[in-house]
């Protein structure tokens, strides 16, 4: 349990992984669902959403693509790969990239 909590804190704060990626990586290491849920509870919802908002705004400005659809796809792929929830990613993509 201690490993899972430290893993979640580190990967969330340093690598900026979302909950889906954290869950998958812990499952890959044969950690039980109960321990995974306890570890994910360490992440404050407000902090989670604030980090997501900051990262998305920064990323939207970094992507240099003139075609809106390609830019949106790159944006979406970037965050889905890092395990952020798809409904959050799509909502933010259509909000920031027009």
Regions found by a protein language model. Name each.
Residues 1-98:
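An alpha-helical, amphipathic repeat domain used for nucleic-acid recognition
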